[in-house]
């Protein structure tokens, strides 16, 4: 049983279960997580596509954090409505090289393009949102803003 058994992140049961899954997954790899998501009524995209965003960002963050020294294993993930926008922020640390070809990130799991971040980008663009990726020396940060209809 993970520590998140029963953690209530939001009122949406599907999204809450997904967040619990990733929190447990991170916990098993001794990755510290700070997850604050308000996903109650006004989701900026259909629930299934919201789960694509959350799942891909958290899975990438967990995969990048696993090989790090324990004190650097930390993920911060936030999602909330601010005015007419829904904002998502994902921050994690990483080691090694982040490869890109043009605008596309290359996968660290296999040769070729990374599908996860591209899937997130497609959902964000489909709903007229904006996504920025800031790659620092050790820190990887994704910021998303999607208008709420």
Regions from the language model: what does each represent?
Residues 128-138:
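Glycine-rich ATP-binding loops of the HATPase_c
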């Amino acid at each position: 049983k993970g520590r998140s058994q029963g953690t209530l992140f939001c009122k949406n049961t599907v999204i809450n279960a997904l967040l619990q899954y990733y929190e447990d997954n991170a916990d098993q790899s001794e990755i510290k997580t700070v997850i604050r998501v308000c996903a109650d009524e006004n989701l900026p995209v259909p629930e299934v596509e919201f789960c694509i965003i959350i799942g891909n960002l958290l899975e990438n963050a967990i995969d990048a954090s696993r090989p790090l020294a324990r004190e650097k294993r930390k993920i911060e993930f936030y999602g909330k409505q601010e005015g007419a926008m829904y904002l998502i922020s994902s921050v994690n640390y990483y080691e090694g090289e982040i490869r890109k070809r043009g605008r596309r990130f290359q996968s660290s799991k296999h040769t070729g393009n990374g599908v996860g971040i591209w899937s997130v980008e497609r959902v964000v663009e489909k709903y007229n949102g904006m996504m920025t990726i800031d790659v620092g020396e050790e820190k990887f940060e994704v910021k998303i803003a999607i208008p709420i209809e």
